[in-house]
């Protein structure tokens, strides 16, 4: 049903069936959306015309009113409804069916002229923006409707829209329609059905708007899913003091706490809450008290000015609370609900599974499991692997925080800590981010057009809006830190400054925000790693209960290894030795080895490197005691280590006692036309076996020392970049001969394995021959992808955006494993290798090792483990568990 009716349409139908009060309406299916883009607007309107008019008559009968009628008018809303939730990304039109005559009939019917004209001016503005294309495209453009509203409010001497009287609202309608005629050259449509078809087509068109396309890319939503269109009878929250509108959540979307919460506005329409135009009040008393404490408002003032719905509308609150519980129990998930109260009658406009932060996701899944609402498999499948990343992000350093200057406090809309340079426009946020700057997007309020900037920013700060504003909902969905409703800040877009309690900050100044408690600080505050909850640990234990695939880490330092072990890594799948050479003392010895005139010179330099390497390995083995550590022998081309600047070459010449010219010539001789396919990997080891000998001594020497100290090291030595069996055999011979000598010298023997990286396509094709000698395979999917596609990983950015836009590629193959090409090479190599060595251990150690779809593929083809960066380990563990569960579905 969801695939056909979209999430909103399916949920409305389901709510109706279980007895939740829903305004009548109908849904145009997602299939029609695809036909709309295939056959065109006119063809689809002709096909739908009779069905839509028949459905409108059905709504008229239920509401006992008539669409377009002057005396007893039916007004409708037209909303999008994709299969997956896309909050704010597509378009909505409310109060459709009004014109100059109908508005007078609505005023007479409701005995509320202000409500009628307020609804009309909102409709003209919304229709003008969405259907007639009057919404500003560029950041410097002025919204004609907002400019008119500000002029009228200024002339009247009021601050808020709801302070305008009936005559003011009539003035707005007249001026709005004049603006429509001036900008579009057409009169504003007065025919109700003309308005309806314009709105339906605009919602379909919004499926392909820029922000919707960007959101689909972020969330992995296919374009062919399309959106449904929901046409629903309007109910009004702006009919006076017994009417209201609001958004609520069955649990806290930021923390996951099992606490009903939300916001409402009396005498308002739903868009007012989510757009952040007015800062709303809390639904529950406890929520209101927490809000007041954050704002520094006394209890007496809170009760008098900002009462909760629980206090101001107790009967409505009781019904709302009962129905939200009913909906959560029905869907077995946290619900995000929109509602309207029209003259004392509660209506639900929609419910959906609520967007939530990573922390809330884990807590809700685990607590619902404990409450018996869901089982273990559902709890695991309910968690999105990539969202676990949010739990692992740093928080502000407490000591630095104690010295920081607090500027103001807003609402804690999305948890976490963020600091960066202030920018005021979404385009600038994206541009600054691309230039390597960390930024915080500061806005009066955000809108869906700001999506790209929000994605690029470290965090978002808004002057207006509540916990359910656009900024809050989208930031939580992205896992971005957000502080909203910071009313003390005064944003000036023209001067690109923000004034906070007398302090003026300009674009480019540093600011720090805490989305967990709402505080805003001056300057840049250092961060420290986050502490994980008991729910997280329990989720990880549950992952291990179901997963078959093990998760190792890519780590080159004891700190990285310690982090990964804390996240549950069961070994190191890739320890890159070259990263150990870049300290000041080590790099000099490394350069001496590379630039030496002969073997003796190289050996002399290698003797200097040996103790450094051994000390590094010893610390890593100690950290990973009892777990396997897979060490890759030297891989990059040598030119990456040598100095290319004159100063560096002069220093090397002095250190080695040779001329600068000699150094320059040696450096020049190391440069290659295509270094990634040149003198690197096992080719270095076979050309200079003394390098392999030194590294073997360092690896196994460290293990021997630790064994004597009572530790239990498990070294694995990996030969990189082989394409021919003989390349491996030559390196294995050096390794084993060196090991035999070393063990004799040390008087202790360490079990170790020698394996290889499968990253050259020929190695995958001849894996059966290679497995006759190699004790394990580790697939280096970065280089395997590079060589299979023939794409340079360093240069793909020059054409990848075009390939993605034209759908030549669906995803970046360096981020998501190509299952049809690279994946088939992996599958073939595993089968060939195990045909010779049945117990052959196989894993991957490229960037794909922490990407959920790639992890699931690795499970499918029978790998033993994946290896990824430390902070991706929990993500891979969850994906590995989900892979097992998905097989059984």
Residue ranges with predicted function:
Residues 1, 414-456, 822-839:
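C-terminal accessory/binding modules appended to enzymatic or scaffolding proteins
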Residues 1-404, 412, 437-440, 447-452, ...:
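Nucleotide/phosphate-binding sheet-loop regions of phosphoryl- and nucleotidyl-transfer enzymes
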Residues 26, 463-465, 484-487, 575, ...:
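Short beta->alpha connector loops at strand-helix junctions that form conserved
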Residues 50-54, 218, 380-432, 438-439, ...:
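Long, charged amphipathic helices and adjacent flexible linkers at domain junctions
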Residues 79, 532-535, 542-889:
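Conserved alpha/beta-domain cores
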Residues 458-464, 482, 843:
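A short, small-residue-rich loop immediately preceding and capping a beta-strand
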């Amino acid at each position: 049903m969801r695939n056909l009716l979209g999430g909103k349409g399916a949920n409305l139908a389901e709510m109706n069936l279980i007895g939740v009060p829903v305004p009548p309406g109908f849904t145009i299916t997602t299939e029609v959306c695809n036909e709309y883009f295939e056959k065109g607007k006119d063809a689809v309107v002709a096909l739908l015309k009779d069905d839509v008019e028949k459905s409108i008559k059905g709504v008229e009968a239920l509401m006992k009113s008539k669409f377009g009628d002057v005396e007893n008018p039916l007004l409708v809303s037209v909303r999008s409804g994709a299969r997956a939730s896309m909050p704010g990304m597509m378009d909505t039109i409310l109060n459709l069916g009004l014109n100059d005559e109908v508005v007078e009939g609505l005023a007479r019917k409701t005995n509320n002229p202000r409500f009628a004209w307020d609804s009309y001016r909102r409709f003209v503005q919304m229709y003008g923006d969405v259907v007639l294309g009057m919404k500003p495209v560029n950041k410097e453009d002025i919204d004609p409707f907002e400019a008119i509203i500000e002029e009228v409010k200024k002339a009247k001497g009021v601050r808020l829209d709801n302070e305008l009287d009936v005559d003011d609202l009539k003035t707005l309608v007249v001026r709005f329609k004049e603006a429509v005629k001036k900008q579009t050259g057409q009169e504003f449509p007065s025919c109700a059905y003309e308005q309806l078809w314009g709105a339906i087509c605009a919602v379909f068109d919004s499926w392909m708007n820029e922000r919707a396309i960007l959101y689909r890319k972020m969330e992995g939503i296919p374009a062919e899913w399309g959106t449904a269109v929901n046409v629903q009878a309007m109910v009004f929250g702006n009919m006076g003091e017994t009417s209201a509108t609001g958004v609520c959540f069955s649990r806290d979307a930021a923390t996951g706490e099992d606490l009903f919460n939300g916001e409402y506005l009396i005498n308002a329409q739903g868009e007012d809450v989510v757009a952040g135009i007015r800062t709303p009040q809390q639904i529950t008393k406890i929520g209101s008290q927490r809000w007041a404490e954050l704002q520094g408002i006394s209890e007496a003032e809170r009760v008098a000015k900002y009462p909760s719905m629980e206090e101001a509308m107790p009967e409505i609150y009781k019904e709302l609370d009962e129905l939200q519980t009913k909906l959560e129990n029905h869907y077995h998930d946290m619900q995000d609900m929109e509602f309207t109260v029209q003259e004392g009658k509660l209506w639900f406009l929609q419910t959906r599974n609520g967007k939530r932060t990573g922390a809330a996701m884990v807590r809700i899944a685990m607590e619902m499991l404990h409450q018996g609402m869901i089982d273990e498999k559902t709890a695991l499948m309910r968690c999105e692997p990539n969202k676990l990343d949010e739990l692992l992000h740093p928080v502000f350093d407490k000591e630095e925080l104690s010295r920081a200057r607090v500027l103001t406090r807003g609402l804690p809309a999305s948890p976490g800590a963020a600091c960066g340079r202030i920018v005021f426009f979404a385009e600038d946020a994206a541009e600054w981010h691309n230039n390597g700057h960390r930024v915080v997007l500061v806005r009066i309020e955000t809108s869906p057009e700001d999506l790209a900037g929000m994605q690029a920013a470290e965090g978002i700060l808004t002057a207006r809006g509540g916990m359910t504003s656009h900024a809050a909902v989208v930031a939580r969905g992205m896992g971005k830190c957000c502080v909203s409703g910071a009313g003390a800040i005064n944003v000036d877009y023209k001067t690109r400054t923000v004034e906070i309690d007398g302090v003026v900050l300009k674009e480019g100044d540093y600011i720090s925000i805490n989305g967990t408690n709402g505080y805003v600080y001056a300057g840049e505050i250092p961060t420290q790693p986050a502490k994980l909850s008991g729910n997280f640990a329990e989720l990880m234990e549950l992952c291990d209960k179901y997963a078959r695939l093990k998760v190792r880490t890519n780590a080159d330092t004891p700190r990285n290894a310690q982090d990964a072990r804390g996240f549950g890594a069961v070994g190191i799948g890739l320890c890159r030795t070259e990263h150990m050479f870049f300290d000041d003392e080590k790099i000099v010895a490394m350069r001496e080895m590379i630039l030496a005139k002969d073997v003796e010179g190289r050996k002399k330099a290698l003797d200097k490197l040996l103790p450094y390497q051994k000390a590094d390995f010893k610390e890593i083995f100690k950290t990973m005691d009892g777990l396997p550590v897979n060490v890759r022998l030297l891989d990059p081309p040598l030119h990456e280590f040598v100095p290319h600047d004159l100063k560096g070459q002069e220093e090397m010449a002095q250190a080695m006692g040779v001329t600068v010219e000699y150094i320059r010539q040696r450096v020049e001789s190391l440069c290659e036309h295509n270094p990634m396919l040149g003198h690197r990997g096992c080719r270095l080891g076979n050309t200079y076996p003394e390098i392999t000998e030194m590294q073997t001594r360092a690896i196994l020497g460290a293990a021997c020392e630790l064994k004597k100290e009572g530790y239990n090291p498990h070294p694995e030595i990996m030969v990189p970049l082989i394409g021919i069996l003989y390349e491996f055999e030559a390196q294995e011979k050096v390794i084993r001969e060196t090991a035999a000598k070393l063990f004799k010298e040390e008087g202790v023997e360490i079990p170790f394995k020698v394996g290889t990286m499968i990253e050259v396509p020929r190695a995958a094709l001849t894996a059966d021959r290679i497995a006759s000698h190699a004790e394990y395979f580790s697939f280096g999917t970065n280089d395997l992808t590079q060589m299979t596609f023939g794409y340079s990983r360093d240069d793909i950015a020059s054409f990848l955006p075009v390939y993605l836009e034209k759908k030549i590629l669906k995803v970046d193959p360096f981020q998501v494993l190509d299952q049809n090409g690279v994946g088939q090479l992996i599958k073939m190599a595993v089968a060939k290798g195990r045909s010779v060595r049945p117990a052959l251990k196989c894993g991957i150690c490229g960037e794909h090792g922490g990407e959920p779809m790639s992890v699931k593929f690795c499970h499918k083809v029978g790998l033993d483990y994946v290896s990824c960066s430390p902070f991706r380990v929990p993500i891979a563990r969850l994906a590995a568990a989900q892979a097992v569960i998905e097989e059984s579905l």
